[in-house]
């Protein structure tokens, strides 16, 4: 565990939250504001941002913190450059926390996905985080170029990956690889931005209730649901509470449930630890049982495709018979 004594201390600070028009980003904005932390909400859709501002303000009407929003397409690099220039140069606002929460999943079988689906996955789940972080870091370096590395103020970048980056499986080819890329990016930037007093954390949420989660259920293959199991998603606000609590305790690899923590033990690598001694033990156990678990999952996948193929043939035969009757 790195930065074990580095608590968030959100009160009186400023947070920039990208992807704050709904879901986890909006709930993190709510929780931070309730801790008297000023928040800038960033997303593309102004009407959604205004609605979130009203919701958050009504939760703590006597709060001294400020709430504002910026419309920005974080998948567009030049939009991000303009955002940071407006904040740091024009408005003299230098966020202490940068939460990269933009993301969406279209769970389908690989053969059912379209080029547009993949483009959305890349732009929303990876490019947004990359653009915001890179343009922000460049703006800070340019603005404070007269400072030595250790003189930069403390800043904190929080990436949101997913538990499926620990264990990717059928149905998530549009989503999981990009969340794995976020995990990898966080490791690299911990090295490259750390010398400039940036703390870099990566969050790996499990299922939580949100608008996005409801949309996922509409396209999610039955085999994907079967592998995930019937666990009930936690609320978005509970997820935000867990994340902020773990970050405040100094953890830079954050999971939101026990299953996520267990799966994280299977791919420890150079990730910052969370209960590291126990993770090493669980990791050893995983190295023994993982081949068996993979066999069981793959057996179910084979069964799914065989059943699916049989059903498609039967449906085709029924349609063909009906067409022949019409012809006669």
Swiss-Prot record:
Which pathway does it serve? Lipid metabolism; sphingolipid metabolism
Indicate the residues that form the catalytic site: 161 (proton donor), 175 (proton acceptor), 179 (lowers pka of active site tyr)
What reaction does this enzyme carry out catalytically?
Answer: sphinganine + NADP(+) = 3-oxosphinganine + NADPH + H(+)
Positions occupied by motif GXSXG: 19-23
* Keywords of the record: Endoplasmic reticulum, Lipid metabolism, Membrane, NADP, Nucleotide-binding, Oxidoreductase, Sphingolipid metabolism, Transmembrane, Transmembrane helix
Gene Ontology terms for molecular function: 3-dehydrosphinganine reductase activity; NADPH binding
Q: Name one GO cellular component term.
A: endoplasmic reticulum membrane
The primary site where this protein sits is endoplasmic reticulum
The record, for InterPro entries, names: KDSR-like, NAD(P)-bd_dom_sf, SDR_fam
**EC class name:** oxidoreductase
Q: Which family does it belong to?
A: Belongs to the short-chain dehydrogenases/reductases (SDR) family.
Q: What does this protein do?
A: Catalyzes the reduction of 3'-oxosphinganine (3-ketodihydrosphingosine/KDS) to sphinganine (dihydrosphingosine/DHS), the second step of de novo sphingolipid biosynthesis.
Task: From the Swiss-Prot or TrEMBL record, give the protein name.
Answer: 3-ketodihydrosphingosine reductase TSC10
Name the source organism. Debaryomyces hansenii (strain ATCC 36239 / CBS 767 / BCRC 21394 / JCM 1990 / NBRC 0083 / IGC 2968) (Yeast)
Task: Recall the taxonomic lineage recorded for the source organism.
Answer: Eukaryota, Fungi, Dikarya, Ascomycota, Saccharomycotina
